[in-house]
Amino acid sequence: MRIGVYGSSFDPLTYIHLWTANSVLQHKHLDKVIMVPANTKRQDKSLHASNEQRWEMLSLAVADNPKLEPSRIELDQTQRDLLYSYKTMEYLHRENPDAELFFIAGADILAELPNWTLGKQLIEAYQFIIVSRDGYDMGKILSGHPLLRAYDDHFSLVYKGFANEVSSSYIREEFAYGGDPRYLIPDVVYNYIQQHNIYQRGVLNHE
């Protein structure tokens, strides 16, 4: 079995997240993509909706697609030192010992991978599917760092097919300042946000 692991804030989940997961699933012939929302305890994230709110939005959005599987592995962690991508991949590997795991990441974070906590171990141990982002050249990034060069065969690229990006921070700001981003997110996510008055604030931090 071939499994992609797609971690993100999903704050909120957008159609871009779903398009990305499904594009990788199709182009790399994966059996499923496990979608992992980040825990609010993570120090490298500035999250706005709670763990449970983001879990509900994700679960509602993928309920009709068995190949997109939400996971609570990070949300249920109580120890901050376990909230690292390498630890998540280790856990999923133990849960799926016969599967080939692929870490899904955007091209914009590729250059930072060696600087992540346990980033070296992550790069050495797993295969990566890098999703194209406008303005980022994967070949140049890989050649620019000795660790990435040494494991360049661990990285493959997926083109999403379009350059436009709709960030979660843009969605949050639309809600906060009276906009109506209903056509940028799934209906179930839009309705959940409205029902629970999420992101209804004056000033928001960007991701």
Predicted regions and their residues:
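Nucleotidyltransferase catalytic core that binds NTPs
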Residues: 1-207
